[in-house]
Each structure stands twice: as structure tokens, then as C-alpha cells.
């Protein structure tokens, strides 16, 4: 996970993933925005942290179930998933034990095509 060392909501999202049994490695690049650009993230999908798994990008506060579903069957040409911005009721932002709501999970591919994957 590429993130700012001072971002608390990123740390909360990481805690959720670790509680679910995922081994998370954290990187604090000097210039996070430049790192995102170098990875190929479309800037309109930007959030506070970027996760790279098996060469795919996962931007922002994506629920674990959406990441797992994507990794189980990645669409041809796909680059990853994103939850743009910092939605208040997303993983790492929502109060514990509250249902996720008010945001969309967007798929993006190498051609720049955006696809609605899930909506909470």
C-alpha cells in the first residue's frame, strides 16, 4: 500500500485488511501523487492510498469483497478498481460495524474505459 505516513483513514483501511488475514506491506513514497501517476492510475479516480496486488491497482477505500471478486476473475485488459475520493461510509472511513454506503466501486482498464463494478 502506497500512502502518506500521516493518513489515519489509510491506516484504518489497512487494519481492516489485516484483520481479514491479508499481509499488508506499507510504503511511504516521497511524492505519492507522482507514484500514482507512474503506476498508471487515472487521476480522476484518485483517493488517499494505492494498493498493488498481482500487478493490479486498487485505489482508495475499496471493500475487501470487491477486491477478492476482481482478483478471482479479472476482466481482460483491466488495470484495477477504485473508490475515488474519500467517501465517509467506506471501509476505513465508516464507524466500525456500520454498513458501507454512499459510494461506487469503479473498474478501469488500459484503454481508459471506466465501468461501474459495485455501488453501496
Locations of the language-model features?
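Local sequence-structure signature of Cys/Sec-based thiol-disulfide redox active-site neighborhoods
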Residues: 1-20
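Short N-terminal micro-motifs specific to bacterial/archaeal maturation
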Residues: 1, 23-26, 58
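Stable alpha-helical elements in mature extracytoplasmic
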Residues: 6, 13, 28-31, 63-67
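Conserved helix-turn-beta segment immediately C-terminal to the redox Cys motif
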Residues: 14-34
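Thiol/selenol-based redox catalytic cores and closely related redox-interacting motifs
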Residues: 38, 44-120
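Charged, low-complexity surface patches
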Residues: 5-6, 25, 40
Amino acid at each position: 500500500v502506497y500512502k502518506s505516513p500521516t493518513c489515519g483513514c489509510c491506516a484504518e483501511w489497512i487494519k481492516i485488511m489485516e484483520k481479514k488475514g491479508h499481509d499488508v506491506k506499507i510504503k511511504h513514497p516521497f511524492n505519492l501523487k507522482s507514484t500514482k501517476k507512474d503506476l498508471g492510475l487515472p487521476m480522476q479516480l484518485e483517493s488517499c492510498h494505492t494498493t498493488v496486488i498481482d500487478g493490479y491497482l486498487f485505489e482508495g477505500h475499496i471493500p475487501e469483497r470487491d477486491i477478492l471478486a476482481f482478483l478471482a476473475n479479472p476482466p481482460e485488459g483491466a488495470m484495477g478498481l477504485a473508490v475515488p475520493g474519500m467517501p465517509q461510509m467506506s471501509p476505513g472511513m465508516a464507524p466500525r460495524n456500520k454498513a458501507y454506503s454512499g459510494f461506487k466501486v469503479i473498474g478501469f482498464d488500459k484503454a481508459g474505459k471506466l465501468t461501474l463494478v459495485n455501488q453501496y
